[in-house]
């Protein structure tokens, strides 16, 4: 059983029900909808295809709506892409409606002229083109091309070291968020997060719509790295988005940030995704490079909950093969990690709450007894996430009456989720475990499982109970 989850970005290469179902069969756990591209109608069709494929295969798939965020972009070039050569002069302008040519182009960010100063760099298209600011004349930012290349419509701009004053949510993001909430998505990701306070507007809109979802903070700005503790505390999970992060800060720092982010998220029992260019060469080739295989494996060894595919699945030539390849790499890395048994407690992972201590006790009891499964009964997913963070080699099953929780736990390491009725007592929990695990052939009579839950049942965040149970046997104390 693979423990780390796979997030796949949907796009033109995955369109059509048969392709979507093939992704699910190959191992997709979370379908990511990149709302920077496409229309609501296109995304709605993909949404329906994923839900149908999930129902038909019986493989739960969570749906993640990834908001564009305050991404600064170029405007439109009147006559198509333009080649900028080293030493050329090029002007960025915030004048409304400015058309682009080989001498100038507009930008989506009206405050650009106020935020940059001469000498600073402006990077275009993830750093492929580098401009240096030479002067500012009202709404016009004059630059010299330091590294040339082709620029075209709506390419992204990065301003390394510049604290831009854009809001956390654009008007487009608000419209996309409301659409995602009404459509029925399971998880939301917020781009270009800079502080824990950035979640406030998202929660305000969710409350207006009457639906709170987990919000994942994308770590892709130096300000986010500086505020990582604050962000992990405020958000429901994080994504290490290495594309923009590697443009905004020195490349050699990105692996260090990745390891720190994974450690911090695990300490707080929050899911963490490692993303961007994991199997990038498979956009065009049927096999990854050795370095890419090592990258995926090392993210798993570091302890990430999930690894993500972007262009590899959304526009690549081999989307299904890429998912299969990633699954094989993950499983091979985990075979080595899990062979070491239950990881010992350290200063970084020791429990700091009652729920965390109870979850650790369940993991250790399971280890001592050679349990077949650890079982978490959970309303919100909290109990399962607390158990997951200890990375026990014993498979972890979550039982929940909430369909949304089932989908959301697809992002958490090692959790396989069963949907069942609300259990109003510990005896009802035991009966449900016996029935489902025997029905699906997951256990034999007499197998040991360790159950953890909250008592009274149904109270979110109240993990306080551990029970050792032998499948199919009445082990209630008399």
Question: What are these model-predicted stretches?
Answer:
Residues 1-478:
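Non-catalytic helical/linker scaffolds that mediate oligomerization, partner binding
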């Amino acid at each position: 059983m693979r423990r780390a989850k796979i997030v796949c970005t949907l796009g033109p290469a995955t369109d059509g029900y048969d392709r979507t179902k093939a992704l699910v069969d190959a191992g997709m756990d979370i379908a990511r909808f990149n709302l920077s591209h496409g229309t609501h109608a296109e995304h709605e069709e993909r949404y329906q295809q994923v839900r149908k494929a999930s129902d038909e295969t019986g493989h739960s798939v969570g749906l993640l709506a990834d908001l564009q965020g305050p991404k600064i972009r170029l405007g439109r070039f009147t006559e198509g892409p333009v080649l900028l050569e080293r030493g050329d002069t090029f002007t960025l302008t915030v004048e409304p409606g400015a058309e682009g040519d080989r001498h100038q182009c507009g930008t989506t960010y009206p405050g650009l002229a106020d935020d940059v100063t001469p000498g600073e760099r402006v990077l275009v298209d993830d750093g492929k083109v580098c401009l240096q600011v030479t002067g500012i004349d009202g709404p016009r930012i004059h630059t010299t091309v330091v590294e040339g290349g082709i620029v075209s419509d709506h390419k992204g701009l990065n301003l390394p070291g510049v604290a831009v004053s854009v809001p956390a949510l654009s008007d487009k993001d608000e419209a996309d968020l409301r659409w995602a909430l009404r459509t029925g998505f399971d998880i939301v990701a917020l781009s270009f997060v800079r502080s824990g306070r950035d979640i406030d507007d998202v929660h305000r809109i969710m409350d207006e719509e009457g639906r709170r979802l987990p919000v994942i903070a994308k770590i892709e700005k130096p300000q986010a790295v500086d505020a990582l503790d604050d962000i992990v505390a405020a958000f429901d999970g994080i994504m290490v988005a290495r594309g923009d992060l590697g443009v905004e800060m020195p490349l050699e720092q990105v692996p260090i940030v990745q390891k720190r982010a994974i450690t911090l998220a695990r300490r707080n029992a929050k899911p963490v995704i490692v993303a961007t260019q994991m199997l990038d060469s498979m956009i065009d080739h049927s096999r990854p490079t050795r370095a890419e295989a090592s990258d995926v494996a090392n993210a798993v060894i570091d302890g990430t909950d999930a690894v993500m595919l972007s262009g590899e699945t959304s526009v690549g030539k081999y989307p299904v093969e890429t998912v299969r390849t990633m699954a094989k790499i993950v499983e091979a890395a985990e075979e080595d990690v899990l062979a070491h048994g239950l990881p010992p407690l350290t200063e970084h992972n020791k429990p700091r709450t009652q729920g965390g201590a109870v979850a650790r006790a369940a993991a250790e009891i399971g280890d001592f007894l050679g349990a077949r499964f650890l079982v978490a009964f959970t309303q919100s997913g909290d109990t399962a996430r607390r158990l997951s963070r200890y990375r026990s080699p014993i498979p972890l099953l979550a039982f929940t009456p909430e369909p949304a929780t089932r989908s959301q736990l697809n992002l958490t390491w090692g959790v396989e989720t069963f949907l069942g009725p609300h259990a109003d007592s510990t005896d009802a929990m035991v009966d449900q475990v016996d029935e489902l695990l025997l029905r699906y052939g997951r256990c034999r009579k007499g197998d040991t499982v360790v159950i953890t839950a909250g008592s009274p049942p149904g109270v979110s965040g109240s993990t306080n109970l551990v029970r050792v149970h032998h499948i199919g046997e009445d082990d209630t104390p008399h």
